[in-house]
Amino acid sequence: MSFTVVIPARYGSSRLPGKPLADIAGKPMIQHVVERAEASGAAEVIVATDDMRIKEGVDKFGGRVMMTSSEHSSGTERLAEVIEQLALAENEVVVNVQGDEPFIPPEIIRQVADNLANQRQAPMATLAVPITDAEDIFNPNTVKVVTDAAGYALYFSRAAIPWDREHFSADRATNVVTEHYHRHIGIYAYRAGFVRRYIEWEPSPIEQLESLEQLRVLWHGERIHVAEAILAPATGIDTEEDLQRARKLAGDG
């Protein structure tokens, strides 16, 4: 099954400026992401950026890069521009991989693409992993997802969902049974035609409250299929501390 990977990459980051080009084990972070995406078996891997510094960095290691508008407010809008530039067919599967995931397993990139290809009821698919640390349930940086019996998302939230009324009180938990909780992984597969529709929708109130773009899909009545990832990726890199941990993990810190 053929699919395309698009990696949106911005130079400007409030917490870690220039992070796509941050060195990890002698390579820029974005190169690690590209190489893992290529190892997934994708037909094409494209970095989408609005910054010449990132373009030049990708050119140096021979990756494919597309320049996109600096007016985009989200990675999905940047993805949509790439879809138009490539003139992808409506049913072409496109996987959006975050540019700050240098250790993302290639296997789960392929998994989310295959998952969408096998879905007839959803135009979009993503992944989650079980939460094993109760503290993550209350961490707003850990996005939780609840699904129905068939694996379709009911809701994504930074809050503790579902709420365990037997064991939760305000902001802490005791004797939590974590088996009911899943952490959302920020990797998505879409059908190209759906992305074209998505960017025409106005941002939804719940999306703006939670600052979770995927809630726009549920708000407008579409479905997102969520599968359990076959491998749990390391968390992405957002801060200098994250970067130092990544360097140690890569053996150069």
Curated annotation (Swiss-Prot):
Main localization, broad class: cytoplasm
Catalytic reaction equation(s): 3-deoxy-alpha-D-manno-oct-2-ulosonate + CTP = CMP-3-deoxy-beta-D-manno-octulosonate + diphosphate
Enzyme class of the recorded protein, top EC level: transferase
Entry keywords, A to Z: Cytoplasm, Lipopolysaccharide biosynthesis, Nucleotidyltransferase, Transferase
GO molecular function: 3-deoxy-manno-octulosonate cytidylyltransferase activity
Xref: SUPFAM superfamilies: Nucleotide-diphospho-sugar transferases
This enzyme's EC code(s): 2.7.7.38
Gene Ontology CC annotations of this record: cytosol
UniProt xrefs under InterPro entries: Cytidylyl_trans, KdsB, Nucleotide-diphossugar_trans
Compartments reported by the entry: Cytoplasm
Gene3D superfamilies recorded: Spore Coat Polysaccharide Biosynthesis Protein SpsA, Chain A
CDD domains attached to this UniProt entry: CMP-KDO-Synthetase
GO biological process: CMP-keto-3-deoxy-D-manno-octulosonic acid biosynthetic process; lipopolysaccharide biosynthetic process
Biological or metabolic pathway of the protein: Nucleotide-sugar biosynthesis; CMP-3-deoxy-D-manno-octulosonate biosynthesis; CMP-3-deoxy-D-manno-octulosonate from 3-deoxy-D-manno-octulosonate and CTP: step 1/1; Bacterial outer membrane biogenesis; lipopolysaccharide biosynthesis
HAMAP family registered for this protein in UniProt: KdsB
Sequence similarity: Belongs to the KdsB family.
Primary role: Activates KDO (a required 8-carbon sugar) for incorporation into bacterial lipopolysaccharide in Gram-negative bacteria.
Name the UniProt record assigns to this protein: 3-deoxy-manno-octulosonate cytidylyltransferase
Native species: Idiomarina loihiensis (strain ATCC BAA-735 / DSM 15497 / L2-TR)
